[in-house]
């Protein structure tokens, strides 16, 4: 059971609306806290955000039982984690020790009590409840509200939007893959599962000395890997000899694991494995599959001299969804993760984003363009949208030209006379030059943690990216609110001096 938020005020504890935030600091946290405070104290926005949180996190749940972390705390802590690019230990320390953050959370301490203290596992279990679709909806609300502030400031009814779309790679938290080290990863994880089962009283024939097997296999892996790394005289012959020894022992171990799986399957059918043992057995089957795959790849590439097709390769046994991304950049020839396309406006807000998993640039442009047209029609003029050459698609450009006044999408390769004339227009060239501003937005987004994702699994990867985008936009909203406050204070000082 969860509640939206109920601040139990005690003596000396300030309401969230009265929490003082140091807006003179240039640190990234105060603007975020300012934006969160504004969400909480603005009735319409507060209701819209909490309605979304309540619908996604509490639908189908009973209204009885123990209270969990409330919805407001989940949103605040998730945003702060990405704003600071923090791990959960850092977040725990901030949640328990940072006075302004605790004030926004509604658990501020007083002279008489320290107040509520969070636990590590509580943060881990609750922040991960937010999913990509929920965060995407909240992000749209925040962008629309911030645009409303800009409309009020500029005194316009409809806002002209000039969009810029670009992509970069969000990396995963994995080591650089080779077929040799992926085979070793598979071997050691199989041995780990056997070790866990052995420690719980499951005796498997031929695998009693799993620690010895681990030491022996690591030695064989290191010998082959060092020859591969250092090269030297007769490199290919020496590598083949070393790899033969490595794969021979791997074959022997694989056969033992196969026999162990058959024994464990019989034990499972007879009800001899408890839940913990059954989970280790399931993991053993998974890692055995990876072992067989990478053992085959090592034999094909090194011993048989085959060129392995890209479709047959995997880049991690733990995160097999990651892509090998090579964008031709000087200092990052290869990145392992997923490309992310973002669309920003002239106010540097990220109005939409799309993780490019199994799709190319042009397809991502179609998805982003479609959502922008759907979400930002009423109260907006879609003035322009710009891309780089990688997004070029004749069909995409034609589709967008039906909704945007100007579409900047340079064509790769040879151009027709009409295309040359279009790209030579002064307005076209001006918007194309302004497109590079999206790079600074990407850089700031990377500083919000969306450069390398530490969370495991594709679902958590998507959530992490969406939370980073939301945190980025909240900081932009906070900066705008702080600027308005300063302008109002300056105007007030001028009036007082004139009086």
Say what each PLM segment does:
Residues 33-76, 420:
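Basic, short loop/linker segments at the boundary and entry of helix-turn-helix/winged-helix-like folds
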Residues 1-48, 483-499:
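Charged, often Cys/His-bearing segments associated with DNA-binding zinc-finger transcription factors
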Residues 307-344:
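Active-site cores of enzymes that catalyze phosphoryl transfer or operate on phosphate-rich substrates
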Residues 65-69, 99, 385-395, 414:
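Acidic, metal-coordinating catalytic cores used for nucleic-acid/nucleotide bond scission
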Residues 285-289, 426-499:
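Basic, amphipathic alpha-helical segments enriched in Lys/Arg and hydrophobic/aromatic residues
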Residues 77, 91, 119-127, 159-171, ...:
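Short, conserved catalytic/metal-binding motifs centered on acidic residues
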Residues 329-376:
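Electropositive, glycine- and tryptophan-enriched low-complexity nucleic-acid-binding patches
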Residues 108-319:
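Active-site- or DNA-interface-adjacent structural scaffold in DNA-acting proteins
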């Amino acid at each position: 059971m969860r509640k939206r938020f109920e601040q139990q005020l005690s003596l000396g504890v300030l309401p969230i609306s009265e929490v003082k935030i140091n807006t003179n600091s240039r640190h990234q946290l105060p603007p975020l806290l300012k934006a969160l405070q504004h969400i909480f104290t603005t009735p319409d926005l507060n209701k819209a955000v909490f309605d979304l949180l309540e619908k996604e996190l509490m639908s189908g749940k009973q209204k009885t039982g123990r209270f969990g972390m409330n919805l407001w705390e989940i949103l605040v802590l998730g945003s702060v984690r990405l704003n600071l690019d923090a791990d959960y230990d850092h977040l725990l320390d901030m949640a328990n020790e940072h006075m302004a953050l605790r004030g926004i959370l509604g658990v501020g301490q007083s002279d008489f009590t320290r107040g509520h203290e969070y636990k590590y596992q509580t943060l881990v279990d609750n922040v991960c409840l937010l999913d990509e679709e929920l965060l995407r909806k909240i992000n749209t609300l925040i962008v629309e509200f911030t645009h409303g502030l800009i409309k009020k400031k500029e005194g316009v009814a409809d806002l002209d939007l000039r969009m810029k779309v670009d992509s970069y790679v969000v990396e995963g938290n994995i080591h650089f893959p080779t077929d040799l080290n992926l085979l070793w990863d598979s071997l050691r994880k199989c041995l780990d599962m056997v070790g866990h089962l052995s420690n719980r009283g499951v005796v498997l024939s031929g695998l009693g000395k799993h620690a010895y097997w681990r030491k022996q296999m690591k030695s064989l892996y290191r010998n082959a890997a060092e020859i591969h790394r250092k090269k030297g005289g007769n490199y290919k012959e020496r590598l083949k000899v070393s790899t033969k020894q490595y794969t021979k022992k791997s074959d022997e171990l694989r056969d033992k694991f196969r026999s162990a799986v058959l024994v464990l399957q019989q034990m499972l059918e007879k009800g001899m494995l408890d839940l913990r043992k059954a989970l280790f057995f399931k993991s053993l089957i998974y890692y055995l599959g990876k072992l067989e795959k990478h053992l085959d790849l090592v034999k094909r590439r090194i011993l048989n001299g085959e060129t392995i097709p890209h479709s047959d390769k995997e880049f991690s046994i733990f995160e097999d969804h990651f892509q090998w991304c090579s964008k031709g950049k000087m200092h990052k020839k290869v990145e392992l993760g997923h490309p992310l396309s973002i669309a920003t406006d002239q106010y540097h807000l990220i109005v939409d984003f799309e993780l490019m998993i199994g799709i190319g640039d042009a397809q991502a442009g179609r998805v982003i363009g479609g959502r922008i047209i759907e979400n930002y029609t009423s109260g907006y003029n879609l003035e322009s949208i710009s891309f780089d050459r990688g997004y070029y698609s004749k069909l995409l450009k034609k589709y967008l030209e039906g909704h945007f006044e100007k579409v900047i999408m340079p064509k790769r390769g040879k151009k027709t006379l009409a295309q040359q004339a279009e790209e030579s227009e002064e307005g076209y060239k001006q918007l194309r030059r302004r497109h590079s501003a999206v790079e600074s937005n990407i850089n700031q987004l990377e500083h919000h943690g969306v450069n390398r994702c530490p969370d495991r699994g594709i679902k958590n990867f998507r959530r992490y990216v969406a939370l980073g985008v939301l945190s980025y936009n909240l900081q932009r909203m906070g900066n705008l609110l702080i600027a308005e406050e300063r302008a109002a204070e300056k105007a007030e000082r001028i009036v007082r001096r004139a009086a």
